[in-house]
């Protein structure tokens, strides 16, 4: 009985691709190189048996039979002669002992591979479900076509150049990794809705649409109306995302609001990394009209004290090359921080955050062999976000104290950022 162990000769891929897969003995479909020649399984077995038995065949005709797939059994002498003519060599045939050793080697490799596979870190069903839920929540609350941006008050890039704007171009030379970003998640919202109403809406109905924003005349901060609408819209989407985090709805309304008020700008900054480009240090949200550079943000009242670390953060986060699963888990961890001002049930919030953190660590172990530092780098990004949040709050307060500017902000922005405690 023929051995099931292959004794085929391995040949380079380039040669394999250029050689027709036809048996050189009988013209049947070849299965590879066997004993130094391209043959079918039938002729491979015939040659092995003939050599092992040291068979001696005699042609009943004139010794020049044409061997084909249909007649290859009619003349063994000419078939064997054809095998030798195309280069098949008995030296390539394994002895019974060699065949047994090869079988054992193949089995040992299979066992080792099975053991490695069994030892590989795996996610539990519960952890996989948490990831799937968060990815789905992100997809439902982040429209990467940015189609709703046209509903905001239009961007106006003309106007007086501020000191920050004149220095903003220098940020385009940044290429190293470090701290944070500016906000611009997907979709628009009712500027008359407050945070409590939005929480109730998402609690009862889930995701909702968002009406058009009114166009108003701008002030010297020409981009403020547009970016105020963008941030208001992004806050609504963060609320929608938060409501789908496993366990978030079970928190008290007070704790939900406290978490959202304190973390909204940080989650927006995290989400905005999806549209951030390392090539020109800008956020591209669709067409040219909705491509934002640092100079645009200075025209909404922010200074380089926020924007420089913001861009460094975006660069650093982008260079981590996070999987989408890691990105959404990081957003959930950010949102579920028990040390936020106003949170009452710290233990419950911390338990939710710990569970998501464990999922992130398990995912990294399963998908980044040797990437032990990745989790620490991601958590450092959350620390960077705290600093950015603090600077954003300081600059927001300065802006909101000026009536001509605060009137450009939406009620939701005023509520979320107006009551922050730092």
Swiss-Prot record:
Q: Which positions does the motif 9aaTAD occupy?
A: 411-419
Q: Which domain of life is it from?
A: Eukaryota
A Pfam family the protein falls into: zf-C4
Cite the InterPro entries for this sequence: DBD_VDR, NHR-like_dom_sf, Nucl_hrmn_rcpt_lig-bd, Nuclear_hormone_rcpt_NR1, Nuclear_hrmn_rcpt, VitD_rcpt, Znf_hrmn_rcpt, Znf_NHR/GATA
Q: Does the keyword Zinc-finger apply?
A: yes
Q: Name one GO cellular component term.
A: cytoplasm
Q: Keyword annotations for this protein?
A: Cytoplasm, DNA-binding, Metal-binding, Nucleus, Receptor, Transcription, Transcription regulation, Zinc, Zinc-finger
Residue spans with biased composition (Low complexity)? 163-185
Residues binding Zn(2+) 2, per UniProt: 59, 65, 75, 78
* Positions of region (Interaction with coactivator LXXLL motif): 243-261
Q: Which Gene3D superfamilies match?
A: Erythroid Transcription Factor GATA-1, subunit A, Retinoid X Receptor
Task: Give the subcellular location.
Answer: Nucleus; Cytoplasm
The NR LBD domain is annotated at 126-418
Q: Where along this sequence does the record place binding of calcitriol?
A: 142, 234, 271, 275, 302, 392
Instruction: Give the UniProt tissue specificity note.
Output: Detected in embryo 24 to 48 hours after fertilization, and in intestinal bulb.
- A GO BP entry: negative regulation of transcription by RNA polymerase II
Where in the chain are the NR C4-type zinc fingers? 23-43, 59-78
Q: Principal localization?
A: nucleus
Which residues participate in Zn(2+) 1 binding?
23, 26, 40, 43
Q: Where is this region: Hinge?
A: 96-125
Task: Tell me the segments the record calls region Disordered.
Answer: 106-128, 145-190
What is the UniProt domain comment for this protein?
Answer: Composed of three domains: a modulating N-terminal domain, a DNA-binding domain and a C-terminal ligand-binding domain. The 9aaTAD motif is a transactivation domain present in a large number of yeast and animal transcription factors.
Protein purpose: Nuclear receptor for calcitriol, the active form of vitamin D3 which mediates the action of this vitamin on cells. Enters the nucleus upon vitamin D3 binding where it forms heterodimers with the retinoid X receptor/RXR. The VDR-RXR heterodimers bind to specific response elements on DNA and activate the transcription of vitamin D3-responsive target genes. Recruited to promoters via its interaction with BAZ1B/WSTF which mediates the interaction with acetylated histones, an essential step for VDR-promoter association. Plays a central role in calcium homeostasis.
Family the UniProt entry places it in: Belongs to the nuclear hormone receptor family.
Quaternary structure per UniProt? Homodimer in the absence of bound vitamin D3. Heterodimer with RXRA after vitamin D3 binding. Interacts with ncoa1 and possibly other coactivators, leading to a strong increase of transcription of target genes.
What's the protein called, per UniProt? Vitamin D3 receptor B
Which organism is this entry from? Danio rerio (Zebrafish)
- The organism's taxonomic lineage, starting at the top: Eukaryota, Metazoa, Chordata, Craniata, Vertebrata
